[in-house]
Amino acid sequence: MKSFFSFCVIAAVLAGAAPSVLAVTANAPTAAECAAPATQKRMNECAYEDFLAATASYAESHKAVASKLPGKQRELFLRSQKAWMAYRTAACDFESSGVQGGSAQGMVKWQCAARITRARVVELKAMGNCPEGDLACVRLKK
């Protein structure tokens, strides 16, 4: 079920859904519950909610960058983002493999995905701040 929901979140990101739409989940734990989760199930849920928050931030940054790229560059950017998502999934599958089948697997996987997603947001935001002389930095339209 979570794999299907992840697919839906990714599809929504690529379709440009509003971050607030992505953050809505049924029975989401509260911030207080996540500050001191009492069970592994709650830790898994909190890690998943953190991933959704990171995904919402990614969606916002992704949309901002894509909207400022001309045709061919935009196509290349979108292709790179699909490849990045595949990388993130594979990296987190690997990272969580040490606890595969255990009750903490979901938590480890969602924490990994949130961490990698936040790192990508930093990279996307940097695209708007190219230092003078950096020819490898993609300059966005204003």
Region locations from a protein language model:
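Positively charged n-region of N-terminal signal peptides that target proteins for export
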Residues: M1-F5
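Bacterial N-terminal signal peptides
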Residues: F7-S20
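N-terminal alpha-helical modules
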Residues: V21-K142
